[in-house]
Amino acid sequence: MTAISRDRLAEAAARHGLDLVGVTDAAPLPDARERMAASVEAGRMGLMGWMGGERPRVASEPRRHGPEVRSVVVVAAPYAGADRARWDARPDALRDVLAPLLESAPAEPAGRIARYALGTDYHAELRSRLEALATELRAEGLESGDVAYVDDRPLAERALAARAGIGWIGKNTNLLTHARAGSWVFLGALLTSAELEPDEPIRTTCGSCTRCLTGCPTGALVAPQTIDARRCISYLTIERPGVLDAWEAEAIDDWIFGCDVCQEVCPVNADADDSGPLLVPLLPLIEWLLPLGRREFDRAVGESALRRAGRHRLLRNAIAALGNAARDGRLGDASEARSLLERAMADTREEVRQQASTAVAFIG
């Protein structure tokens, strides 16, 4: 088998927009397994039942994905600030999808969409880059059979990235790096049968800093490196099915897809190039979503990350955020909002109808 140098691997990864790369072996990750299993056992995964069962063990043992696996190549690709252009290149990037709404309406009241979702859905884009890297490495003589993982199958990518020296896992559970991008990175991994020299882990820690723990608006970070998904805005707006109860609806504030607060307050990101989350005017967004069916919505958003939530969940979130704006006196003229919510109360989806009934009460 042909070996490949660390510099050669980094050069190849950079050609595919993968700025950070590290290598680790395929040994199990017992700490990651125990942490995942403990969260499932404590109920901190909310309604994500698929996180239980054998998943913690499979995710923490790379050779469960193939007995021939010997090494894991982990990559990180920045996505915030100037790096966002890489993910906005396709015509179905979120900014293009929502451009008419962004250009034709005042900013208030607005809903926030997390930075990671602003371009094309990273799963497909990053996987294509990883597969291109694997093809190039095979041309260098590495054995075939490489498999690309991008947060779409059970694999403890953050733990592997930390062991591969790309960064360390922060108290906010994100991977923190010394690179300009800080924690604003997507992670992916190649599992390969090649015997590659592993990198040394970074010894950096968060020290005594607790900004993410105290800065989380819902108290979802219940301990260092421990998150209760049931209180996490990202979980509530993306994964939580059904109607948001009173606490949940208020908790999301004006976030309608994801949340970035625990990264925004992190000092590691103080010098990161960052242009902020996407602000989408709520009234035109709701008006746009109301008449759409599922297939129409899927066609409209293309390969953006909004597909994960779907039309009904995004609409539910926008309605809850509109109710919060009304409650906090940020609505201004309420006539248009009331009209939209009355239409939403006749929607085909129960969660939309009920969320609208709750929100309209704040308008009076």
Q: Which positions does each model-derived feature cover?
A:
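Short coil turns that connect the paired helices of HEAT/ARM alpha-solenoid repeats
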Residues: A305-A309, R343-E351
